[in-house]
Curated annotation (Swiss-Prot):
Pathway: Purine metabolism; IMP biosynthesis via de novo pathway; N(1)-(5-phospho-D-ribosyl)glycinamide from 5-phospho-alpha-D-ribose 1-diphosphate: step 2/2. The gene is purD. This is Phosphoribosylamine--glycine ligase. SMART domains: GARS_A, GARS_C. Residues 112-325 form the ATP-grasp domain. It comes from Methanopyrus kandleri (strain AV19 / DSM 6324 / JCM 9639 / NBRC 100938).
Amino acid sequence: MLKVLLVGSGAREHAIAEALCGAPDEDVELYAFMGNRNPGIIRLAEDYVVGDPTDVEAVARAAADWNVDFAVVGPEDPLAEGVADRLEEEGIPTFGPKRGPARIEWDKGFARELMEKYDIPGRPEFGIFEDPDEACDFIDELGKPVAVKPAGLTGGKGVKVVGDQLKNLDEAKEYVKEIFEEDIGGIPKVIIEEKCVGEEYTIQAYTDGEKVIPTPAVQDHPHAYEGDKGPITGGMGSYSCPDGLLPFITKEDYERSVEILERTVEAIKKETGEPYRGVLYGQFMLTAEGPVVIEFNCRYGDPEAMNILPIAEGDIVTLHASIAEGSMEGEIEFLEKATVCKYVVPEGYPESSEGEGDVIEVDEECIHRYDAVPYYASVNLDEDGKIRMTSSRALAIVGIGDELEQAEEAAESAIRECVSGERIRHRSDIGKHETVEKRVRRMKRIRGE
């Protein structure tokens, strides 16, 4: 029996908890340090604490009190605060990189400079600036659409692109000033990049800092509303395909992307002196020239974790424990199944608190009948047993099927028939044939096919 600490309380962490507790290779006793009372994790946990996951001392105390064998950290914020370093000081191996290697996410400037220094392919033209005037001059010099990125963590909502959230270069320059004036991201630095044109996708890879095991490619849908409209969110849903690729990605595109991840793992160790232990998440854009790195994350994606964990088979506990120890062992395979994840969110998400505090009713037996799986996110289990929403994403439903169409129907039916609430919504277009085909056609145009 292994005692495992799980840090975090979103749908991603619920999926991790289910994967660890349901794994055949090792019995697990789960302990959770959560930011909210996630009913799915509470049900699986032997014991739990509700607190601030970025309070590394509190996390370390809880881990020591429970005498855990190893820890798994879900979100990026605790990793950026050095929770893995602090747990290691207590003698607790941790799945999730120390603060130095985690810088690949919490400082976007570091990520770009690392790629440049070690000549890792997939770099757009970019500049890093600590002075807003210099950044604005660079935008003028480029004279073409740009992406404006705060250097620090913004919960996936800080990047703005000309032609999407920004109308023109003048608005880009206004946003640069706003980043410095409002301290967006918490680091007084901005990255300006040429706008890449193509289709975005994610590949997550397990690594102990030496070996790398890639997982199926996933496509996220960050826009709030159907048809890829509205503000950027933490992710409204995602899909994966039975062959581990996506309809617009070739095997060669996938392999080139994995090579970028492998070289990045190697570069992180050389640069920081610390091996990267955990999941390295690469967000790519497939362009006419091939894969370009949009950004790296230092943990499982949310929602992308929900596309790979339910179809993972093999030594899941051994894999996580051995990565935490620093020498990856265990076999992991992925079923040749399609997955579609759709998030149910409060009506006002992400711009207002409309729906916050409302009860959401979830019939789990009904969901399972549709070949779907529920993962609870930013909700709280009341003392009276009711599940109440916060202002963030509430519930992820993952449909699984032999083909993408089946998986999408499973997720959509489960939401429509098994989930209810007065002020909830979801994107029904995620994983639908028309949505995917639109992306395939666009990619063919870009590649001149």
